Every structure is written in C-alpha cells, then in structure tokens.
UniProtKB/Swiss-Prot annotation:
Positions contributing to Mg(2+) binding: 84, 88
Highest taxon of the lineage: Bacteria
Family the UniProt entry places it in: Belongs to the Nudix hydrolase family.
Molecular-function GO terms, alphabetical: hydrolase activity; metal ion binding
Species of provenance: Clostridium acetobutylicum (strain ATCC 824 / DSM 792 / JCM 1419 / IAM 19013 / LMG 5710 / NBRC 13948 / NRRL B-527 / VKM B-1787 / 2291 / W)
Cofactor(s) this protein cannot do without: Mg(2+)
Motif (Nudix box): 69-90
Gene3D superfamilies: Nucleoside Triphosphate Pyrophosphohydrolase
Protein name in the entry: Uncharacterized Nudix hydrolase CA_C0446
Length: 206
C-alpha cells in the first residue's frame, strides 16, 4: 500500500511541511481533517447522523462519531474531503452542497501517539433514509440518527442518555435495527465546544 502523506502545520495553522501519516501521529504534528455532519429533517424535527466505527479501528473502536470524516492528504484542498462521504456512506455530494461552519482544534492521546487536528467542520443536508446508505464496512458498521434538541440536553448533562435509532451491520453484512439509549461512553470524546459549534449552526438554521 502506498504511504500516505499529510501537510503539517504550526499551532496557528501555518503550513510548515509534509510528513507521513505514521510520523504525524507519532510526533504529534498538527494536520487537517474533514468532518461532515449529515443532517436529516423530519417535519419540525432535525436529526444528526452518527456513524458507528468499526471494532478493529486503531482509535475509538466501536464508538459513535461524526457522520463522515477523514484526513486531508498533502496537496489536497479541504473541499477534497467530500470524497469521504462517497467512500464511507455512498453519498454523492458536491463541495458546493456542503455548508462550512467552522474549524476547531482537537488533541487526542492514543497510546504513545498524539493526534492533533484542525477539524474543518461541514454540514450536509440529506433527505434520504439512513437505511439507504451504502457503508464502507471496513470503516463503518452502523448508522444512527439523534434528534438535536435531545442531544443538546444530553451534552448539557440535563439527561443521562440520548435516544438513537438506526441500524448496525454484522460480520456477514446483515443489517439489524438498532434503537437504544446511548451514554457518553458510547461516543468519541470530542470537546464540548466541538458539538456546540454544530448545534449552534443547526439551531440558527446554518
């Protein structure tokens, strides 16, 4: 497999070079990632779509996370990250259909590695039922939708769990309906401010 290279940045997001993805995570270089939240509106309710990460992922296995995300490779633009929607969810979207809602810095310590990201966050509105999505099964093993008002109460610690509904895929590729209450241990631990950026944009109607 061809080695993947990423552009690296200082803390002010000034370009300082190019390193392999392995070295970026080993040495904790800042790099860019594409995060896209798929939004589904049903009547007066608005839902965010969360993906369930594959159980063999090296980071946050089996946890629920942003609808679609990926690294921006060296020389790519942030908008090139739209390919992740196609690869992970089977969604054909054009860059001009996505709404850019901001950038947030995040830092994760994973074993001996340090993952420092400039997360470029986008919103994509899609009317399709999540059951129609085509998953990249070595990356994603399920999708759920969560209503944003309930999610906001959950993040503010006003409720202990949040209702999620969707499906999971087993090793044979069969889909099973999923309806359950999720708690904070079920989610990738993004900063509180990360989710606030997303919810504020949705509640302000972008």
């Amino acid at each position: 497999m061809e080695e993947e290279f990423l552009d690296i940045f200082d803390e002010e997001e000034r370009l300082i070079g190019r390193k392999s993805r392995k070295e970026v995570h080993e040495k904790g270089y800042w790099h860019s990632t594409f995060h896209c939240w798929v939004v589904k509106r049903e009547g007066k309710k608005t839902f965010l779509i969360f993906q369930k990460r594959h159980p063999l992922k090296d980071t946050a296995p089996n946890m629920f996370d942003v609808s679609s995300a990926g690294h921006i490779k060296s020389g790519e633009s942030i908008e090139d990250g739209v390919r992740e929607l196609k690869e992970e969810l089977g969604i054909d979207a054009k860059p001009n259909e996505l709404i850019n809602i901001g950038i947030i810095k995040e830092e994760f310590h994973i074993g001996k590695n340090i993952d420092r990201e400039f997360c470029h966050i986008y919103i994509y509105s899609n009317k399709a039922e999540i059951e129609s999505y085509t998953l990249q099964r070595d990356e994603v093993v399920g999708l759920v939708k969560i209503e944003i008002d309930e999610l906001a109460r959950f993040l503010d610690n006003k409720i202990d769990g949040v209702f999620a509904e969707g499906f999971i895929v087993n090793q044979e590729g069969r889909r099973y309906k999923l309806s359950k209450i999720l708690n904070k241990d079920d989610f990738v631990p993004h900063k509180y401010g990360y989710y606030k950026i997303v919810l504020r944009a949705l509640m302000d109607d972008y």
